[in-house]
Amino acid sequence: MSYRKAAVAAVGLALLASGAHAAPFEAVSFKKGQSALVYDVGSVRREGAMAQAWVYQIVAAPMDGASMVATFREFSCAMRRTRDIARRFVSPDGQTLRSVETPGEWQDVAPGDERFELMQQVCTGKPQRIAGQQMSVFDFQTVVRDALGAR
């Protein structure tokens, strides 16, 4: 079974069994090795050639206790660059382990870069939605980690 089919099946089951722990979000997901890169369609804000969105990297095996990194990311669509404005490192149970509130440096994003497809989706506003709409990000994290075979 492919990753997307497994994630969709797991999301469907989780929707039946779970309650929301945080505000619902609309997810679009990109698989990235043993992690998934997800952004909240509802958080996208555009002004001219600039866009901002909440992006979540969910990992199968926690790194320093964090199973998810929630990043408020800014995109310079015309210049094909991106930077992180703020980041939160979150445990599997939704606790913030640490946060970084200092904007990072701009980084160029070229075709082939893992952030390229994400930037195109955020900048063009044509996401392909997946199952799991209106789940909390924490419930979604659990479903994605299960689909990734979390340890």
Put a short name on every predicted segment.
Residues 9-17:
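Bacterial N-terminal signal peptides
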Residues 6, 18-21:
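Intrinsic disorder/low-complexity segments in short proteins, especially the signal peptide
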Residues 20-71, 75-151:
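N-terminal secretory-pathway/extracellular module detecting exported/lumenal segments
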Residues 1-8:
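Bacterial N-terminal signal peptides that target proteins for export
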